[in-house]
């Protein structure tokens, strides 16, 4: 499983839920991601091995892109340690880990993308990555039908909406009548301006 930047944003948190479900079912998982972040909370599972690299954003976009390309080269090369393993699936979380996706395809492995972004509202770089994803992926998991509607590839695309962590759901005690009277709404969203509405009416 490949994820570029292990922080506490939405995509690594969703990946954590997915991986935890697989780990509890006994799957052996190799996680390749940066140091720190939400995914490190899975390290106590004995059937998970983590391979880390240093990665962070810079205020200088050129430095950020150089770091990104270095990580793609590193993970592309690292990926070949699974060349002779059978029944290996390369799970690519977000558009960004294109290096291991390409290596997986070269080796004849099954490549599954979990596509969190909407590349077609983010600019040329993400549009190029989305085009590459559609060429390399055996399966693309989208988080909404709206997001999937922008993809040219339709055959291998499925929609799986993001879930909330089970420990959060367990704390809920729904009372629909009381909720209707209170008229309070919980809106879960990103703090990033381009992802969130400015007003909720």
Could you tell me what each predicted segment is?
Residues 5-8, 59, 98, 107-125:
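A short, histidine- and acid-enriched strand-loop-helix "catalytic/donor-clamping" loop
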């Amino acid at each position: 499983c490949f994820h570029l930047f292990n922080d506490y944003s939405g995509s690594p948190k969703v990946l954590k839920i997915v991986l935890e479900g697989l780990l509890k079912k006994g799957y052996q998982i190799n996680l390749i991601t940066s140091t720190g972040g939400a995914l490190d909370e899975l390290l106590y599972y004995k059937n998970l091995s983590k391979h880390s690299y240093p990665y962070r954003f810079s205020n200088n976009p050129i430095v950020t892109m150089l770091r990104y390309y270095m990580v793609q080269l590193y993970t592309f090369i690292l990926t070949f340690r699974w060349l002779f393993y059978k029944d290996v699936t390369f799970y690519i979380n977000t558009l960004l880990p294109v290096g291991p996706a390409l290596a997986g395809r070269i080796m004849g492995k099954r490549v599954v993308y979990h596509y969190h972004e909407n590349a077609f509202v983010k600019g040329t770089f993400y549009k190029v990555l989305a085009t590459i994803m559609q060429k390399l992926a055996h399966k693309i998991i989208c988080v909404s039908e709206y997001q999937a509607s922008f993809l040219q590839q339709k055959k291998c695309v499925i929609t799986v909406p993001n879930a909330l962590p089970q420990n959060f759901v367990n704390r809920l005690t729904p009372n629909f009548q009381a909720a209707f009277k209170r008229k309070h709404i919980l809106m879960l969203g990103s703090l990033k301006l381009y992802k969130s509405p400015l007003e909720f009416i």
